Amino acid sequence: MGLQLCQLCEIAYFVTDKIPLENVLLTDYVTTDSLLPNKEGRCVAQNLPPQKCALTHFKCGDVLVANIRPYLKKIWFADREGGASADVLVFRAKSGHSQEFLYASLLQDSFYDYVMKGKKGSKMPRGDKAQIMRYSIPKLSLSEEACIGNIILSFCTKINVNRRINDNLEAMAKQL
């Protein structure tokens, strides 16, 4: 018996809850520009939107993916609650599924290749939300999902720590 697959929509959904801009701090605001390319997480946004608006309300453990130029592979596993701009897709694991496994599934290059196959537009391509939710992922038990997700998240944490160490070493070398 081979590995069974399911569609992304079976384990996750797009968050549509809204939060007023005035309830979001700059440090908790995520836009496509504050998501870093090549799966490097996020930085603090430059500024909040100039006009009052409702943002997508994300929570700790949600997975945020930039939907403009998906080939840039901008993704972040939220470590806080906040608001996201309309061009950021916010995924949340359904009950009975692991948010860490959801992140691990969307972290794969094959996910971005799949999104690009269904893109809309050429200069500023965007992913097709309906097509994205049909992305195939392994169908696993919650314990298997959690195990895989936690391992991948642990690797990502270590990579980020090493990246910060390298950045500090580079800054120190420039001072010599």
PLM region descriptions:
Residues 6-60:
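Sequence-specific dsDNA recognition surfaces
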